[in-house]
């Protein structure tokens, strides 16, 4: 995967560059990302998680082949070159099947890897850190590494079988806490120690050797670690470089390896840039992008209420609230407190559990209704200034068309711009 190996090579030469990974399956987020990469003539890394997309459909209802088809079709419609599009699989392993015995969970994980690789995903994050039903808690580094090596062997064989060569790149290791933001209120976070990072690497190197996979070690481009960044419902733990100095220096001893940082959402632009400088050069972003989508939609809904008679309004916010109350499975175990606290969290939490509800047909209908209502006549500039002030500046300068769709896309791209700036390097 030349874009990624080249990025790592340049970073190791001191260019302080990186790449961001868009972790979302929402069509508007993906359109915003593709159009932004197209305009800036940069490669684009889009990742699916094992929760979103698997051989059985995941929570999006898409298999890896479906997801690839969906993204590639969108890219083609936006004239984005296919060879600049990189697809990655995140947290691939027994994650979805922790309630099953390890043998069964790992058999499913084998099939998961096959389905991702056969579909053309080239960046594979092997994560076998989670305990299954009959496993000790926590797992030892050796068991985690043995399982990852088993999956790497499946990946290599599948890639050669389907594409005639093995050109995958791998990411190993995992962060704490769980993917997708912390469940509980945070105050401070433990940074991965250099010793723990070295132990993970050595366990994986040994396990890969046992599987006859020593030759692929240069294609293991990144180790997932915790540099001390996280968010919960209303707080962000900002990157503190001094706490990660030893970890940052440790990776300089490895010729072909950088770090991958998860949960970088909501970090300041300065923190994002410093993360890349400190070798956390793959920045994952997901909830912050759907959070920006939600912000734009709530703003447009407020504009709609000013312009359209109540009986003709989409009622998007109320429809969203009703659906979330009818189907609480995606937020109930995450949001705590009294009724008002949970109501606020459903709408505004940084963890953005609302992202799981956008595909719902009732919500999608309300969204379409909102866009129709606001597309009928130009949105008054003072209302754009009131509710989308960053976009207002661009509308006034002639950079941006004040249509509902363009306002949404541009608001999401404001977040992407922070990541691009952080990753540009010298």
Curated annotation (Swiss-Prot):
SUPFAM superfamilies: Aldolase. Pathway: Carbohydrate metabolism; D-tagatose 6-phosphate degradation; D-glyceraldehyde 3-phosphate and glycerone phosphate from D-tagatose 6-phosphate: step 2/2. It comes from the Bacteria. One of its GO terms (biological process) is D-tagatose 6-phosphate catabolic process. GO terms for cellular component: plasma membrane. HAMAP family: Tagatose_aldol_KbaZ (MF_01295). Forms a complex with KbaY. Belongs to the GatZ/KbaZ family. KbaZ subfamily. Component of the tagatose-1,6-bisphosphate aldolase KbaYZ that is required for full activity and stability of the Y subunit. Could have a chaperone-like function for the proper and stable folding of KbaY. When expressed alone, KbaZ does not show any aldolase activity. This is D-tagatose-1,6-bisphosphate aldolase subunit KbaZ. It comes from Escherichia fergusonii (strain ATCC 35469 / DSM 13698 / CCUG 18766 / IAM 14443 / JCM 21226 / LMG 7866 / NBRC 102419 / NCTC 12128 / CDC 0568-73).
């Amino acid at each position: 995967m030349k874009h990624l190996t080249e990025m790592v090579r340049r970073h190791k030469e001191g260019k302080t560059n990186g790449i961001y990974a868009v972790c979302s399956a929402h069509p508007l987020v993906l359109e915003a990302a593709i159009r932004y990469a197209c305009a800036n003539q940069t490669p684009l890394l889009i990742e699916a998680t094992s929760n979103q997309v698997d051989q059985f459909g995941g929570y999006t209802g898409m298999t890896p082949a479906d997801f690839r088809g969906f993204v590639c079709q969108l890219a083609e419609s936006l004239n984005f070159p296919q060879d600049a599009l990189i697809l990655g699989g995140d947290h691939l392993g027994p994650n979805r099947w922790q309630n099953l015995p390890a043998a069964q969970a790992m058999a499913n994980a084998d099939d998961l890897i096959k389905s991702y690789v056969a579909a053309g995903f080239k960046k594979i994050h092997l994560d076998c850190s989670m305990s299954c039903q009959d496993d000790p808690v926590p797992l030892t580094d050796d068991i985690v590494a043995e399982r990852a090596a088993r999956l790497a062997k499946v990946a290599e064989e599948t890639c050669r079988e389907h594409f005639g060569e093995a050109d995958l790149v791998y990411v190993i290791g995992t962060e704490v806490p769980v993917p997708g933001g912390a469940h509980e209120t945070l105050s401070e976070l433990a940074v991965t120690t250099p010793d723990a990072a070295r132990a993970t690497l050595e366990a994986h190197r040994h396990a890969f050797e046992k599987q006859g996979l020593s030759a692929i070690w240069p294609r293991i481009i990144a180790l997932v670690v915790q540099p001390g960044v996280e968010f919960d419902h209303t707080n962000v733990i900002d990157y503190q470089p001094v706490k990660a100095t030893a970890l940052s220096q440790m990776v300089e001893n490895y010729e072909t390896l950088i770090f991958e940082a998860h949960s970088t959402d909501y970090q300041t632009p300065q923190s994002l840039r410093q993360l890349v400088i400190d070798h956390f050069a793959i920045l994952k972003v997901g909830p912050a992008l759907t959070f920006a989508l939600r912000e734009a939609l709530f703003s447009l809904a407020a504009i709609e209420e000013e312009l359209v008679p109540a009986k003709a309004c989409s009622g998007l916010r109320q429809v969203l609230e009703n659906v979330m109350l009818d189907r609480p499975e995606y937020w109930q175990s995450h949001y705590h407190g009294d009724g008002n606290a949970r109501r606020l969290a459903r709408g505004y939490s940084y963890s953005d559990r609302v992202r799981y509800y956008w595909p719902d047909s009732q919500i999608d209908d309300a969204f379409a209704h909102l866009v129709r209502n606001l597309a009928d006549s130009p949105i008054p500039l003072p209302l754009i200034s009131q509710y989308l002030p960053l976009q207002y500046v661009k509308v006034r300068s002639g950079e941006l068309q004040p249509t509902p769709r363009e306002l949404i896309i541009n608001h999401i791209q404001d977040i992407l711009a922070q990541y691009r700036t952080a990753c540009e390097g010298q």
